[in-house]
Every structure is written in structure tokens, then in C-alpha cells.
From Swiss-Prot:
UniProt subunit comment: Part of the 30S ribosomal subunit. Forms a tight heterodimer with protein bS6.
Function according to Swiss-Prot or TrEMBL: Binds as a heterodimer with protein bS6 to the central domain of the 16S rRNA, where it helps stabilize the platform of the 30S subunit.
Family to which the UniProt record says this protein belongs: Belongs to the bacterial ribosomal protein bS18 family.
Full protein name: Small ribosomal subunit protein bS18
Keywords: Ribonucleoprotein, Ribosomal protein, RNA-binding, rRNA-binding
Molecular function per GO: small ribosomal subunit rRNA binding; structural constituent of ribosome
Matches recorded under InterPro entries: Ribosomal_bS18, Ribosomal_bS18_CS, Ribosomal_bS18_sf
NCBIfam families, per database record: S18
Gene Ontology process terms (BP): translation
Gene of this entry: rpsR
Superkingdom of the organism of origin: Bacteria
GO cellular component, one term: cytosolic small ribosomal subunit
Amino acid sequence: MPKVRQRRRKVKACKMCEMNVEYVDYKDIRILKDFLNEKGKILPRRLTGNCAKHQRMVKIAIKRARQMALLPYIKY
């Protein structure tokens, strides 16, 4: 029986922790767009490399920006 190789994921460092960001502002659209895919969905932590604390902040900021019509809910 052949051996199955397991892939090891690279652990990405949190960009927000490196920049010492304490608060993610919903009005800063340029930063928030980095955490959306091409259809406008929020990217998961394993793709962005965010820590849990900053991923929650990004999620809340994106949802607030969507409610304020600064970001679209979906892109066609």
C-alpha cells in the first residue's frame, strides 16, 4: 500500500498584528477589499492569515461597511 503524503500548510503571519493595528475601521475600504474575494465574500482565516481577534474585527467592519453602502454585498 503506498504511503500518503500529508501537506503541511504554511502558517501565515497576521498582517494586522505586524502593523500593530488595534482597530479595523469600516470606513477604510482599501484595507477591507483585501479580505474579500472577487465575488465580494469574506475570505477565511486560513487564506488571509489573520489571527482570530483581527478576523473578527475585519468581519464586523465589512458588515458595517456593507450596511452603510460603502461595500457591495455581492459582485456580479
